[in-house]
Curated annotation (Swiss-Prot):
Lineage: superkingdom: Bacteria
GO biological process entries: sporulation resulting in formation of a cellular spore
Protein name: Spore-associated protein A
Gene responsible for this protein: sapA
Protein localization: Spore wall
Gene Ontology CC: spore wall
Natural source organism: Streptomyces coelicolor (strain ATCC BAA-471 / A3(2) / M145)
Signal peptide boundaries: 1-33
Keywords: Signal, Sporulation
Length: 154
């Protein structure tokens, strides 16, 4: 887990927006969708998620007792280590955390205090990514991905 200032290569490359990408033509697709694995810990409940092409899912969780959000990016199938990122940022304070590296099954968990604040969150698996800017603004209830989204490859 690493703290990020103003730059995170994967985030900086896409600017402001939600990015969900599709696999290249002819690419193999997994039949199963990645389920949340509970890695954020006790008390964290899934409040939002986005598919990352057909390769996996990035989950946003929230713990109402601590006021923290947690993000984890999970592959649909484990296998050869693949570049992955899990990212979360409190938009109001600017505090952010990310985990990146070559992983077999998941990146993260990463945490940020965000009680009553909107969060920016996302993930990367290989050359596919999904980003959401300004969602789950202080509410425990899940919200659909909101404003500023874009689809394309990393």
């Amino acid at each position: 887990m690493q703290a990020v200032g103003a730059t995170l290569t994967a985030v900086g490359a896409i600017g402001a927006g939600l990015l969900v990408t599709a696999p290249a033509a002819g690419a193999a697709t997994a039949g199963a969708t990645a389920s949340y694995n509970g890695v954020c810990g006790s008390g964290y409940k899934v409040v939002n998620s986005m598919p990352i092409g057909s390769t996996g899912t990035v989950y946003l969780t929230y713990n109402s007792a601590t006021g923290k959000n947690c993000t984890v990016t999970i592959r649909n199938t484990t296998g050869t280590p693949t570049y992955m990122v899990a990212y979360v940022r409190n938009i109001e304070s600017g505090a952010d955390q990310y985990d990146e590296g070559d992983y077999r099954s998941y990146a993260g968990p990463v945490y940020v205090s965000a009680r009553g604040a909107c969060v920016e969150w996302g993930g990367v698996i290989g050359n596919l990514q999904a980003w959401n800017y300004g969602s789950n603004c202080g509410a425990l209830a899940a919200k659909a991905p909101q404003k500023d989204w874009f689809a394309g490859q990393r």
